[in-house]
Amino acid sequence: MTQQPQAKYRHDYRAPDYQITDIDLTFDLDAQKTVVTAVSQAVRHGASDAPLRLNGEDLKLVSVHINDEPWTAWKEEEGALVISNLPERFTLKIINEISPAANTALEGLYQSGDALCTQCEAEGFRHITYYLDRPDVLARFTTKIIADKIKYPFLLSNGNRVAQGELENGRHWVQWQDPFPKPCYLFALVAGDFDVLRDTFTTRSGREVALELYVDRGNLDRAPWAMTSLKNSMKWDEERFGLEYDLDIYMIVAVDFFNMGAMENKGLNIFNSKYVLARTDTATDKDYLDIERVIGHEYFHNWTGNRVTCRDWFQLSLKEGLTVFRDQEFSSDLGSRAVNRINNVRTMRGLQFAEDASPMAHPIRPDMVIEMNNFYTLTVYEKGAEVIRMIHTLLGEENFQKGMQLYFERHDGSAATCDDFVQAMEDASNVDLSHFRRWYSQSGTPIVTVKDDYNPETEQYTLTISQRTPATPDQAEKQPLHIPFAIELYDNEGKVIPLQKGGHPVNSVLNVTQAEQTFVFDNVYFQPVPALLCEFSAPVKLEYKWSDQQLTFLMRHARNDFSRWDAAQSLLATYIKLNVARHQQGQPLSLPVHVADAFRAVLLDEKIDPALAAEILTLPSVNEMAELFDIIDPIAIAEVREALTRTLATELADELLAIYNANYQSEYRVEHEDIAKRTLRNACLRFLAFGETHLADVLVSKQFHEANNMTDALAALSAAVAAQLPCRDALMQEYDDKWHQNGLVMDKWFILQATSPAANVLETVRGLLQHRSFTMSNPNRIRSLIGAFAGSNPAAFHAEDGSGYLFLVEMLTDLNSRNPQVASRLIEPLIRLKRYDAKRQEKMRAALEQLKGLENLSGDLYEKITKALA
């Protein structure tokens, strides 16, 4: 590393000394050498002697002109071009060269296959030209692209196409103009040869918008679902939020080499092809729903992110937390609200809580950052969305929408802060959110402890609710938060008891604002069964001494699907904790009959939504289970999970087989009822695979060979690998032979290989680095093989001999210089060393020290390693 990366602090924010109002870009494109000409209209806002500091990385400067005159008062510093002696208003012209082909970090302008494309968020524009690369500089962009017509027949950028023409030597040009001022992180350029799916959407005010979806040649038949999802997103945003699209054209381009999931560049979204391409034989139900969600997410950014952007990157959750909330609502309105909520909560409990307990713990609005790319996190996005959801809960839909309208009235066309958003919500609703604001500044997961008491003589039921947030590496002191805590009370017949106090009805969302509070309810005629933290009304851990009877009662009677699922989770948690302790003492699994019977009742319930039944029957992942413990024993957790699966498979064998057969569907449709039945059927298959081996082998093999869709084929393959059935190797080979030329389809196969419970899994993963479908230059391949091994196979990654850690160190050493962003994602499991026993900690620490000693250690890795070793 050349020099130690410097931390940036939120409280150091200063408005820029200069603003750029308009920028005219010309790209003379070539993969090896692209010439960029940037002509900017600049205005000074700071002191008259303030120099103009432009950000730039990996650029070859050709010339600098001010008002058409060659300028000499400039100097290049590391990561910057500093220009002095400037007039108050001026035209700045910079010419520089870049090499897209040499750009393996996939930040700025780079090569994806035969195409050229960009990724500018957060700080990628500085890899294209010298500029004020910060989100509070909003300019109108005009972009002219010149390129070889045969190689790059399509030349795309933001806004509307305003001119085009032919040049000699087989070259052509296109000019684009975006009338909306935007920060440079929203700039995009794509050049290549594509198949195009075209459609139109008529907005509610009657404007016709051209929709264009660009995919690699030969992939057109995998594009229609994405187009359907886009039209659904546009319609939903008009109906639910009153927001209409504002340009004449909306383009999406799918590329194979992409660090993120997708990017909301104004009018020209660039997507990881994983979130665009789907055909029934290549994509699962989950893929279809993920595509719908991500297309929605990027489209919704047009207002929450583009029309109103962030003042600085510390405010990232302003656009991301809000837009994730919007995409969750979109998925819930179009699909099953309960299943969507359950999946959001699985992410929070299994992954985000772990981030809160890690060395990288940060509030949803961080206070200190070294490398901004490291803060595109579950905390900023998913916990950020939970914070928006709490505001929605406290205000209600009507007031929340008034708050949104006020937010746009005040901030459209400008760069705003999280405080601006909360202020708009407060002003529109007259609800005091001053205490609530602590969610933006405090990190960590609050723990809410509930104690209850019933007095049959006074017919009163009392809840005592206390909260504490454990210290995190970034904050020793914690304050009580404003927690909306939703409850329901059930009588012994399973009916909801109306909440009353002093003859008045009480809202079912309790406002918990102090370290400890007591809530008393009158006219409760029996000892009630409480449902607590209904709908996961706040992102907290709940502590309450449940009895098994209470939980099985809620699994049967709760009127809310989420509460039924959550009760099943709590019941399992009791026996996961018990059995991990037993395993550590060398004792066998113990599971009372009534627990198996509670799951049997779900299978036999004819009224239950199959989608909910499937969720209840899906055991928590090993990562979700890990969050039940302070010190994680990955081997014990994996073995308890398998033993639990085998026990339930044996106990419920007849019911599982009956439900499996009853939910067979001959046709495949992406409809929510069909998805629900498939999910339930495949959840049953997963258990059946752990039953009697011969029967399981036949059943799984039959489903794999008869499947007319990827969902069922992959479910069979996945079950074969998880249960280590005799048929697994033959099935895996068949899949490889059929799909080895399709990277996205092979990603599923790589994930199964990497998460296999086989003892020699690491040896297999090492061998697959040489597989014909694998390459270290594609982030999707890296995530599906190396990422899945390190992040989703903890028993193997945390092998006692430290072999998993050494493997990851090798991979990160390569990726550190090749693609620091991807390396930084992969290191996460290694930095959480303090959650493991002393022997593992020692080996993890040694691995981190080895990485810390790399000569050219990237800022991305430096930040995480130094925090982990602190």
From Swiss-Prot:
Membrane topology, from the record: Peripheral membrane protein
Binding site for substrate: 121, 261-265
Cofactor info, note text: Binds 1 zinc ion per subunit.
GO terms for MF: alanyl aminopeptidase activity; aminopeptidase activity; identical protein binding; metallopeptidase activity; zinc ion binding
Keywords, ordered alphabetically: Aminopeptidase, Cell inner membrane, Cell membrane, Hydrolase, Membrane, Metal-binding, Metalloprotease, Protease, Zinc
Effect of gene knockout: A quadruple peptidase disruption (pepA, pepB, pepD and pepN) does not grow in M9 minimal medium, does grow better when supplemented with casamino acids.
Binding locations of Zn(2+): 297, 301, 320
Cofactors, names only: Zn(2+)
Pfam families: DUF3458, DUF3458_C, Peptidase_M1, Peptidase_M1_N
GO biological process, one term: proteolysis
Catalyzed reaction equations: Release of an N-terminal amino acid, Xaa-|-Yaa- from a peptide, amide or arylamide. Xaa is preferably Ala, but may be most amino acids including Pro (slow action). When a terminal hydrophobic residue is followed by a prolyl residue, the two may be released as an intact Xaa-Pro dipeptide
Annotated site, Transition state stabilizer, chain positions: 381
Main localization of the protein described in the UniProt heading: membrane
Xref: Gene3D superfamilies: 2.60.40.1840, 3.30.2010.30, Neutral Protease Domain 2, Peptidase M1, alanyl aminopeptidase, C-terminal domain, tricorn interacting facor f3 domain
Matching CDD domains: M1_APN
Enzyme class per UniProt: hydrolase
Active site: 298 (proton acceptor)
Function: Aminopeptidase N is involved in the degradation of intracellular peptides generated by protein breakdown during normal growth as well as in response to nutrient starvation.
PANTHER family: PUROMYCIN-SENSITIVE AMINOPEPTIDASE
NCBIfam families: pepN_proteo (TIGR02414)
Similarity annotation: Belongs to the peptidase M1 family.
Protein name per Swiss-Prot or TrEMBL: Aminopeptidase N
Native organism taxonomy: Bacteria, Pseudomonadati, Pseudomonadota, Gammaproteobacteria, Enterobacterales
